[in-house]
Amino acid sequence: MSIKDGWKGRFYEDFDIGDIYKHPLGRTVTKVDNIWFTLLTQNTASIHFDAHYASKTEFKKPLVDSTFTVALVTGQSVTDISQNVFANLGWEEIRLPNPVFEGDTIYSESKVLEKRESKSRKNVGIILVETSGYNQDGIVVITFKRRVMVYKKGMSPLSSRPEMKK
């Protein structure tokens, strides 16, 4: 028998420009997700929670709040991209080419576009990824670029994790 560490995510050295990560988890968006998120964020646009109103639009049904889509697809990418994040530096060029509806299942993948050493911090590097989210039919519903500072190997707080006493 051997003791094996669980997945600890990628560190700066693990990324190569051009790498594509197909994030492992899909997520079906529910009516509750949409209503809860619009209430939580105080988004009062009727298109998100008034089925009668939405039935009169070109979409014929409520749209999922687009900021939920940003949050969901960002979250899906964490396991592969930013599990060892020092800081999220922001999103760029967020595009929402197609709507998300209640009942859609969203999947995502990210491509590494840039990688460089941090000029001010020796324990991290900076990567730029382009992430795309798509539904169960393969239709792209969101794309964005995200820049993150990622710890180098042996430099993260996880490196000082204590062992269980026996």
Where are the regions a protein language model picked out?
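Hot-dog-fold acyl-thioester-processing enzymes
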Residues: 1-90, 153-166
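HotDog/MaoC-like acyl-thioester-processing domains
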Residues: 1-17, 100-105, 109-166
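Catalytic-pocket segment enriched in acidic/His residues
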Residues: 61, 74-79, 84-119, 134
